[in-house]
């Protein structure tokens, strides 16, 4: 599947199929330095994903389990050892698009939109404000 990489100020778009592995790395320092939900808080059940600690996200269809919560702008992951056996849920703390030129806090509507896109095998949109880098996509 093709991966389209845009400049950092733009979005990264990837067309993913259910069952594909998405390998990403995130520089958490962006969220730590620029604020955002969870930034600076103590999260004993989370791990920090950095360039030296990449993780693969398995795209699956079905109901999203809120136990596993992936934040694109920080990539917090509950129970990372079980990530391959769960459904990834994406949360955007701030997004920009043609309808919302200024970054806005994520609403349930955006979560629903992202979930529907993954379920329907449509385009998955990642906001690279936290310096998200798509490394590989494989089936």
Residue ranges and their predicted role:
Residues 1-139:
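Surface-exposed, low-hydrophobicity beta-strand/loop segments enriched in small/polar/acidic residues
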């Amino acid at each position: 599947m093709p991966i389209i990489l845009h400049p950092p100020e733009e979005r990264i778009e990837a067309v993913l199929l259910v069952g594909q592995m998405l390998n990403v790395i995130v520089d958490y320092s962006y969220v730590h330095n620029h604020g955002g939900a969870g930034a600076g808080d103590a999260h004993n059940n989370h791990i920090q994903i950095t360039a030296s600690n990449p993780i693969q996200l398995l795209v699956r269809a079905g109901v999203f389990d809120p136990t596993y919560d992936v934040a694109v702008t920080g990539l917090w992951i509950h129970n990372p050892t079980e990530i391959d056996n769960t459904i990834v849920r994406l949360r955007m703390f701030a997004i920009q698009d043609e309808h919302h030129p200024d970054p806005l806090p994520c609403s349930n509507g955006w979560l629903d939109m992202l979930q529907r896109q993954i379920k329907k095998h449509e385009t998955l949109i990642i906001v690279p404000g936290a310096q998200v880098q798509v490394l590989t996509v494989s089936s």
